[in-house]
C-alpha cells in the first residue's frame, strides 16, 4: 500500500490517500502539544511509540468485538485505516477524578467515581473544544440521537474492555478521549487513536503518571513513560 496525496495534517498525525479509495494511511508525528496547541515541542520517537501503542490497543479491542477504523500497522510510524467521516465530538470517559473535572466539580484529583462518566466536547480548536450536552449536539446537528446513543454505549463498552487490560499490567485507566466516524455505509466506528496522548494512565502502585501529563506538567521524559506503557502492554 503506497502513500498518496496528503489529505489532512493535525497536531499529531498526517492522513494520506492510498490506491484503495476507502483505505487511508495515517502517519504519526513526533509533535507534542498541550493546552489547545499553546505548548508545543518535537520529541524524537514519540510518533513511533504512539503508532505502536495505538495499533496494539486497537488489535486488543477488535479481539474483544469492538469495531474500529483500524486495518493494520504498516511501519514504525504508519498504519492503515478505513476511511470515515469524523463526527466532530470528542468523547471523554472518566473513571477517576483528574484534570479539568477536578477543577469543575471540586473533587480532589485521584477520587474514584462510583461509576464511569461519559462527557461530550465540541471538536473545534478555535472554540477550545467546549463541553457540550446532547441538546447542543442536536441543535448543532453534529450527530443524530441514534448515533449519540451508539457512541455513548460504545464508549462504555470500550472502557469495560480497556480497564482490565491496563489493570492486568498494573496501570490504572483514569480517563481517556475517543473519537468516532461514519464509514461508507453510515456505520459509527471508533476512530483516531488510543495512546498515552489520549489517555490518563497512572501506575497502580506508585501513582506515577504514564501519559501526556508528563509533558503538560513538565514531570519528566515523555518517551520514557510511553515506552513503559508499550512494554507493559506486550509491545516492542
UniProtKB/Swiss-Prot annotation:
It catalyses: 5-amino-1-(5-phospho-D-ribosyl)imidazole-4-carboxylate + L-aspartate + ATP = (2S)-2-[5-amino-1-(5-phospho-beta-D-ribosyl)imidazole-4-carboxamido]succinate + ADP + phosphate + 2 H(+). Gene3D superfamilies: ATP-grasp fold, B domain, Phosphorylase Kinase, domain 1. InterPro entries: SAICAR_synt/ADE2_N, SAICAR_synt_PurC, SAICAR_synth, SAICAR_synthetase, SAICAR_synthetase_CS. GO terms for biological process: 'de novo' IMP biosynthetic process; cobalamin biosynthetic process. Keywords: ATP-binding, Ligase, Nucleotide-binding, Purine biosynthesis. GO terms for molecular function: ATP binding; phosphoribosylaminoimidazolesuccinocarboxamide synthase activity. Pathway: Purine metabolism; IMP biosynthesis via de novo pathway; 5-amino-1-(5-phospho-D-ribosyl)imidazole-4-carboxamide from 5-amino-1-(5-phospho-D-ribosyl)imidazole-4-carboxylate: step 1/2. It holds the Pfam family SAICAR_synt. Its EC number is 6.3.2.6. This is Phosphoribosylaminoimidazole-succinocarboxamide synthase. The lineage of its organism: Bacteria, Bacillati, Bacillota, Bacilli, Bacillales. The gene is purC.
